[in-house]
Amino acid sequence: MSDETALPTLMTAMVLTGHGGYEQLCYRTDFPRPSPLAGEVLIRVGAAGINNTDINTRIGWYSNSAAEDGSVTDGSWTGEALGFPRVQGADVCGRVVALGQGVDPARLGQRVLVQACLVSLRQGLLDVWLGSERDGGFAQYVSVPSADAHRINSALSDAELASFPCSYATAENLLTRSGVKAGERVLITGATGGVGSAAVQLAKRRGAEVLAVVSPQKIADCAVLGADRLISRDQPLLEAVGENTIDVIIDVVGGQDWPDLLEVLKPRGRYAVSGAIAGPMVSLDLRKLYLKDLTLFGCTAQEEGVFE
């Protein structure tokens, strides 16, 4: 265990005090600094990314009782009540400044990127997420399991690197779970968002043909990501793509037009989802699901090796 006496006992943090609006966020300069437990490292945060999940966690959107507008009284990524006060922030880049018992001394001083899905703390089938079940990066310091703090050697700034963990790991998990292969036609919704834009780039690296659905005003932004075809969100999907033409759908949107996604999937097609920014309640005709032999993947828990 390394010496923490040179570190402050209090720190600055943005603290969530309950579910609701921005009024539930409190800027504190006297929040207790965490100390690393056995097997953990203490990180001085260089940068922390902001994601939709921070909003969703704040309003309790992940709860099973979530209404269409996301209003609930409690709820975390696991659907259990969130403990308050809570420091949010799933995306963290920083440097190791203290070690818990049993951690390799060589870790001290390392620049690290933290895996938002803390796989080493997996509880049965449920994952522990930074900034939800455990305090995250909206603070000067954060303590995480050493196994989930990955050493990096990059010319990118801390701010640039902090944009990677949640978006890119989620996108890679979607592609991994759905088994995207070279030559397949992959349709990606919300393609200019964090997860969507990452999915476009990662699917292209796998050799897939990528069709990206975007809002009209963001078509030019998405063009630089390398999608083979850009489809305006305003255009009816069946008209733009045609029935039974897509091998895999990567979806982070959901919403009222969701049934059209199953229409464009080929028989034995695969659908993977990890978001519902247009609304979580959708209409499903079970006949469409079983007569086309479709496979649906809900993707939150990350496969081993996805982050690496």
PLM-predicted stretches and their roles:
Residues 188, 204-258:
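Adenosine-nucleotide cofactor-binding segment
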Residues 32-48, 63-118:
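Glycine-rich beta-strand-centered segment in the early N-terminal region that forms part
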Residues 192, 196, 200:
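N-terminal Rossmann NAD(P)H-binding glycine-rich loop of SDR-like oxidoreductase domains
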